[in-house]
């Protein structure tokens, strides 16, 4: 393969990297100008008009870079290999690269209005570098490249979580996320090393062929379990979810939105490839009448624990961001249902659900960002009377909460419907009925705390001190447009779910 062909196949990632470098350069130059102005005036540097303009230029370059990256993905061939198969191009990888880049696009839009960020150029550059990690993850079918993508993504997310130096909770969130993320990486790397030692390969297809011909040995089983534990940390599945509440609450809101959405999409895509392609021969069975050892029972237990713990603990939350964090734990359990089913339909349902969930979470965090800028907090009481202050935001938040609860005709309902249908058909003789029952129980419980949020928005009286100035409304305009766009996407995908579901099903086949 010539260098020109290699550049064409790697164009989406290259465009995002170049955009990150340009954004970083603009941000650094604007800081230098501000620092020189501060020294010459013998006063601390303030956010001057040039700094505001530089922030706008950084956002514009980031948005244009992501848009060009999407166009570059659309121009990729249907199937291709890079670096000897370490990276692959398939309809599935191309589709989810677009989804990940689109989520990064909306995160940049939310970050544009985040006034607490003192260095927006560096922040946007880190978002772009994290997006490169997402694209490498989605496009990889080789364990070594998967680990590289995980580390590039993880290092970026740790910095994003701790980026607000004026807030001690942000530092706490970054530290906890770093400690748990490092533990996750250690488990994943140790598991990969054991799998490589027992199979002699890091390619998923080769590993599958090897596992189909040799008996399962204790070291190999240990490697599989440790790899699954590492990914359980990444998707915040119980009991490996302890980092999520503090990270979601303490991190800057765009960071929390990105961690909750894009990183989970890529993690579920990769986890599905690993268990269904690489570990396929070790599937086992999670049926209540025919339990067989394998990775499927492990994921089934993680799913059940996540659904029960996430939903029950969410009932006690009074902070909306912590509520969304424990809700994310429960939704990780729902999403694992499709992988436990193990079929093509199950994997497709998992991918559809995680995409819908990611869109919904970015929108919900967008509403939280506007409310926080108006009231200074993100507790339930800060959402009181939102319907009177901003009917648009209240309506959008209602769409997001009801979609998360799985209420028709919103997209979240069809996501759960596809997951439950795939699980019901798997295993023979309704073997996964017990897990579906747990998921239905969790869905009923979750409806209560989602309605609590809507009660605060539409029923409770607003605080006397809550008011929005015209300047504040103008500064939050981009966030409001972003939230409205995401709410419209949830409505559209609820009315026409096959628009996305059929594409995913065709890409998986």
Describe the residue ranges of each PLM region:
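Alpha-helical transmembrane segments of multi-pass membrane proteins predominantly involved
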Residues: 1-509
């Amino acid at each position: 393969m010539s260098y020109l062909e290699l550049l064409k196949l790697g164009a989406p990632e290259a465009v995002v990297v170049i955009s990150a470098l340009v954004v970083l350069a603009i941000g650094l130059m604007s800081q230098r100008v501000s620092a020189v102005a501060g020294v010459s005036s013998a006063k601390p540097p303030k956010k001057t008009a040039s700094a505001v303009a530089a922030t706008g230029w950084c956002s514009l370059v980031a948005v244009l870079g992501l848009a060009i990256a999407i166009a570059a993905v659309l121009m990729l061939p249907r199937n291709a290999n890079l670096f000897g198969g370490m990276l692959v191009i398939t309809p599935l990888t191309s589709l989810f690269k677009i989804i990940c880049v689109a989520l990064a696009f909306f995160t940049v839009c939310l970050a544009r209005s985040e006034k607490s960020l003192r260095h927006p150029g560096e922040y946007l550059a880190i978002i772009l570098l994290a997006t490169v990690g997402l694209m490498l993850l989605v496009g990889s079918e080789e364990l070594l490249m998967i680990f590289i993508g995980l580390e590039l993504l993880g290092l970026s997310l740790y910095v994003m979580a701790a980026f607000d130096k004026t807030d001690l909770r942000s530092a706490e969130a970054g530290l906890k996320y770093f400690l748990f993320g490092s533990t996750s990486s250690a488990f994943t790397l140790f598991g990969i090393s054991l799998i490589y030692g027992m199979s002699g390969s890091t390619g998923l297809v080769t590993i599958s062929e090897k596992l189909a011909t040799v008996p399962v040995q204790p070291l190999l089983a240990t490697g599989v379990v440790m790899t699954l534990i590492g990914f359980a940390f990444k998707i915040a599945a119980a009991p490996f979810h302890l980092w999520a509440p503090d990270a979601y609450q303490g991190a800057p809101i765009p960071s929390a939105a990105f961690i909750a959405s894009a990183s989970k999409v890529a993690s579920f895509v990769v986890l599905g490839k690993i268990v269904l392609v690489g570990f396929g021969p070790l599937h086992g069975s999670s049926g209540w009448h025919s339990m067989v050892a394998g990775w499927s029972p492990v994921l089934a237990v993680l799913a059940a624990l996540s659904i029960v713990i996430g939903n029950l603990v969410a009932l006690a939350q009074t902070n909306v961001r912590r509520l969304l964090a424990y809700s994310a734990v429960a939704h990780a359990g729902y999403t694992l249902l499709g992988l436990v089913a193990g079929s093509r339909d199950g994997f497709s349902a998992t991918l559809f659900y995680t995409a819908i969930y990611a869109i919904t979470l970015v929108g919900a965090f967008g509403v939280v960002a506007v409310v926080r800028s108006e009231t200074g907090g993100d507790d339930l009481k800060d959402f009181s009377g939102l319907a009177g202050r901003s009917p648009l935001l209240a309506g959008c938040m209602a769409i997001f909460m009801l979609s998360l609860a799985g209420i028709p005709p919103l997209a979240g309902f069809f996501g759960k419907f596809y997951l439950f249908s795939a699980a019901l058909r798997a295993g023979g003789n309704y073997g996964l009925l017990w897990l579906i029952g747990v998921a239905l129980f969790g869905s009923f419980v979750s409806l209560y705390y989602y309605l609590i949020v809507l009660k605060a928005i539409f029923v409770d009286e607003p605080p006397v001190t809550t008011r929005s100035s015209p300047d504040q409304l103008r500064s939050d305009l981009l966030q409001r447009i972003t939230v409205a766009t995401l709410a419209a996407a949830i409505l559209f995908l609820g009315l026409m779910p096959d628009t996305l579901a059929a594409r995913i099903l065709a890409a998986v086949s």
